[in-house]
C-alpha cells in the first residue's frame, strides 16, 4: 500500500465520520419533540429527601466524636419530622466567582460570574438551574429507617436574611443552616465559599441531645434532565463528552454518557474516597467525599432525571455525642490550575481529552506545553503557533526521513513509469514488479507514511485539547479570530489551508498512482477545507501553521537534494 492510498483511506474515514455526525444531528432533531412531549419533570424542591433506596450503605470509618457505626436498612423508609415539612426560604450566596441559590438541602441554581454565556454578553453561564424542561440540581440530604431526619425545607439559615455576599477584602464566606428535630436531635450544616474557588465545602454536624441513639446516613447526588444536543460539525458542544464520570483508587476513571445512561445497568459499588461528577462542554459538577470516607456510588434514573449519587457514611450517634461528615461540591469550569489546587486524585480526568489513558496523557502533556507558552506569550493563539514550531523541531528527524523517502520515490519515478507502460492494465504484475524494484533498491514505500502516522495521535490529542480547554473559551488570537474554540467566522484560515494543501500536493510525488486515485487526490484540499470550516479555529490555526512550515521545509529539502521544485510541480501536473 503506497503513501497516497494510506492518505486517501485516512481522509475518507474522516469524511465518513463527519457525515455520521450530521446524520446523528438530523436523528436527534427528529426525536427531540417526542422526548419533550413524554417527559414530566418534577421540581427539585418537590423531590422527597428519602429517595435513596440502596442496601449496604458503607458505615463510617472514622467519624470524630461519633458512636458506633450504624446499620442502614436494605430499603430506605425514612421518617421526616412534621416540623421539617414545608418550603424553606431560598437563600442566595455570592462569592467573586459563584452565585448560588439554595434552600439548605439543594443547590437550585448556580451562576458562574466570570464566564459570560456569549463573547459580547454579560449574562453569566448558569450551570445548575431550575429550568422547567431541563432542571439540574445538587442535593445533600439524610436518610434513616427509624430516626427522624430533615425533609424538604427542613434546613433554615441560622442568620437572618436571604442574601449573603463575600465582602471586599474578605476571603471566606461561611453560612450555617440548621435543622432542629424532635427530642433534642439537630443537624447543623455549614456552607463555606472561598474567594476564587469553585469547590464549596459542606460540613454536617449531627448533634444528639436526646436520650436515645440516632441512626442515619448522608446522601449526596447530582440530578439532571440532560439537554438533547444535535450531533453536528456546527455544534462544538456535542463534540465534548456529556454524561457521568466517577473515579475510584481501585478502578480508576470510568464514565457513562447521558445518551446511554442505563444501557449497561445502574452503578452500585462501594468505593473509599474518589469522586463522582456530571460533565458537559467546558464545565462540570462533582461531589468529592473525604479520602477515607466509604460511600456507595450509584447511577440511576429518577423519571426523566439522570442521577449520580454518593450514599454514606452511615453511623450511630450516641446520646450526648456529635458526629461530623464533610464533602466538597464543585460547581464550575474545567480549569486545570484550580482543579489541581483541590489535590484530589484523578480529578484532572474531568478534562476529558480521551477515555483512553494514553491519549489523555498526550493531551495533558500538550496542554502543559501550551499553557507554559501562554505564560510567556500572553495569547493562546500565539501559544498554538509556538506549539507547532516546537513539535516541528521535535519531529524533524521523522520529517527528514519522510522527505528522503520522497526524494527516492522521485528518483525512481521514470522507472516506475516504464513498468506501468510495460504491464499496461495488468495491475497484479505491475504491483509485483514495483515491489521487486523497491526491494532491490531498498526503498520503503511506507517510509513517507510513518511520520504521518506518528503525528496522527498528536493531532487528535491536540484536537481534544482545543475542544475541551475552557482556558481557550472566547480567547482571541488576532483580527477576525476572537474565539479560538469557535469556527473561523470568515473562513479565512480554511481557505489558507486549502491553498497550502494544494501547494504541498504539487510538491509531492505520486508514482504509480492510477487515474481514479489522482482525481480523488485533487479533491482532497477541498474536502479538508470544507471540514476545517466547521471545527474550532484554534485547530485550523494549528493545521495551517503546521502545513505552512511543512511546505517550506519540503521546498528546502528538495533544493538540498539538488532538485528543482518547479520541475516536480510540472511533473505532477501531467
UniProtKB/Swiss-Prot annotation:
Task: Name where it mostly resides.
Answer: membrane
Per UniProt, which keywords does this protein have? Cell inner membrane, Cell membrane, Chaperone, Membrane, Protein transport, Transmembrane, Transmembrane helix, Transport
Q: Name one Pfam family in it.
A: 60KD_IMP
Specify the domain of life of the species encoding this protein: Bacteria
Query: Which terms in the GO cellular component ontology are assigned?
Result: plasma membrane
In its UniProt record, a GO molecular function of this protein is: membrane insertase activity
Q: Which GO terms describe its biological process?
A: protein insertion into membrane; protein transport
Q: In which compartments does the protein localize?
A: Cell inner membrane
Q: Which family does it belong to?
A: Belongs to the OXA1/ALB3/YidC family. Type 1 subfamily.
The subunit structure is: Interacts with the Sec translocase complex via SecD. Specifically interacts with transmembrane segments of nascent integral membrane proteins during membrane integration.
Q: What does this protein do?
A: Required for the insertion and/or proper folding and/or complex formation of integral membrane proteins into the membrane. Involved in integration of membrane proteins that insert both dependently and independently of the Sec translocase complex, as well as at least some lipoproteins. Aids folding of multispanning membrane proteins.
- Which PANTHER family does the record match to this protein? CYTOCHROME C OXIDASE ASSEMBLY PROTEIN COX18, MITOCHONDRIAL (PTHR12428:SF65), OXA1 (PTHR12428)
Q: What is this protein called?
A: Membrane protein insertase YidC
Q: Which gene encodes it?
A: yidC
Amino acid at each position: 500500500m503506497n503513501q497516497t492510498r494510506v492518505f486517501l483511506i485516512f481522509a475518507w474515514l474522516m469524511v465518513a465520520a463527519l457525515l455520521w455526525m450530521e446524520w446523528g444531528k438530523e436523528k436527534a432533531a427528529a426525536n427531540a419533540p417526542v422526548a419533550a412531549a413524554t417527559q414530566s419533570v418534577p421540581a427539585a424542591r418537590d423531590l422527597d429527601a428519602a429517595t435513596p433506596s440502596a442496601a449496604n450503605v458503607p458505615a463510617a470509618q472514622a467519624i470524630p466524636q461519633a458512636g458506633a457505626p450504624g446499620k442502614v436498612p436494605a430499603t430506605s423508609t425514612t421518617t421526616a419530622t412534621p416540623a421539617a415539612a414545608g418550603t424553606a426560604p431560598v437563600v442566595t450566596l455570592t462569592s467573586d466567582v459563584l452565585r448560588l441559590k439554595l434552600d439548605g438541602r439543594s443547590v437550585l441554581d448556580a451562576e458562574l460570574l466570570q464566564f459570560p454565556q456569549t463573547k459580547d454578553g454579560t449574562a453569566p453561564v448558569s450551570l445548575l438551574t431550575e429550568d422547567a424542561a431541563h432542571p439540574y440540581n445538587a442535593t445533600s440530604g439524610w436518610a434513616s429507617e427509624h430516626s427522624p431526619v430533615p425533609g424538604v425545607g427542613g434546613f433554615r439559615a441560622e442568620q437572618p436574611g436571604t442574601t449573603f455576599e463575600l465582602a471586599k477584602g474578605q476571603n471566606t464566606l461561611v453560612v450555617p443552616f440548621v435543622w432542629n428535630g424532635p427530642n433534642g436531635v439537630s443537624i447543623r450544616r455549614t456552607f463555606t465559599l472561598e474567594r476564587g474557588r469553585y469547590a464549596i465545602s459542606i460540613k454536617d454536624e449531627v448533634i444528639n441531645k436526646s436520650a436515645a441513639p440516632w441512626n442515619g446516613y448522608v446522601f449526596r447526588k447530582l440530578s439532571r434532565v440532560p439537554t438533547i444536543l444535535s450531533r453536528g460539525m456546527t455544534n462544538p458542544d456535542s463534540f465534548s463528552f456529556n454524561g457521568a464520570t466517577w473515579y475510584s483508587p481501585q478502578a480508576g476513571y470510568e464514565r457513562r454518557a447521558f445518551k446511554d445512561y442505563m444501557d449497561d445497568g445502574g452503578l452500585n459499588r462501594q468505593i473509599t474516597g474518589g469522586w463522582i461528577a456530571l460533565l458537559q462542554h467546558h464545565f462540570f459538577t462533582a461531589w468529592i467525599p473525604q479520602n477515607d470516607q466509604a460511600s456507595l456510588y450509584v447511577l440511576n434514573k429518577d423519571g426523566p432525571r439522570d442521577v449520580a449519587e454518593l450514599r454514606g457514611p452511615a453511623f450511630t450517634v450516641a446520646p450526648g455525642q456529635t458526629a461530623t461528615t464533610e464533602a466538597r461540591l464543585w460547581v464550575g469550569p474545567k480549569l486545570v490550575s484550580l482543579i489541581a489546587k483541590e489535590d484530589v486524585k484523578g480529578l484532572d480526568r474531568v478534562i476529558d481529552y480521551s477515555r483512553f489513558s494514553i491519549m489523555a496523557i498526550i493531551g495533558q502533556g500538550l496542554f502543559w506545553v501550551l499553557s507554559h507558552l501562554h505564560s510567556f506569550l500572553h495569547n493562546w493563539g500565539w501559544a498554538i503557533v509556538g506549539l507547532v514550531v516546537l513539535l516541528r523541531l521535535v519531529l524533524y528527524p521523522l520529517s527528514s526521513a519522510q522527505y528522503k523517502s520522497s526524494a527516492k520515490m522521485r528518483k525512481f519515478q521514470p522507472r516506475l513509469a516504464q513498468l506501468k507502460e510495460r504491464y499496461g492494465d495488468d495491475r497484479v504484475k505491475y504491483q509485483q514488479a514495483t515491489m521487486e524494484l523497491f526491494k532491490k533498491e531498498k526503498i520503503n514505500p511506507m517510509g513517507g507514511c510513518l511520520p504521518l502516522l506518528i503525528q496522527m495521535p498528536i493531532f487528535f490529542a491536540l484536537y481534544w485539547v482545543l475542544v475541551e480547554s475552557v482556558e481557550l473559551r472566547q480567547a482571541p488570537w488576532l483580527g477576525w479570530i476572537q474565539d479560538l474554540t469557535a469556527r473561523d467566522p470568515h473562513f479565512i484560515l480554511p481557505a489558507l489551508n486549502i491553498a497550502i494543501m494544494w501547494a504541498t500536493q504539487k510538491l509531492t510525488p505520486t508514482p504509480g498512482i492510477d487515474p481514479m486515485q489522482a482525481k480523488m487526490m485533487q479533491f482532497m484540499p477541498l474536502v479538508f477545507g470544507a471540514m476545517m470550516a466547521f471545527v474550532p479555529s484554534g485547530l485550523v490555526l494549528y493545521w495551517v501553521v503546521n502545513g505552512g512550515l511543512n511546505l517550506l521545509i519540503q521546498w528546502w529539502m528538495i533544493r538540498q537534494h539538488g532538485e528543482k521544485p518547479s520541475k516536480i510541480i510540472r511533473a505532477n501536473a501531467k
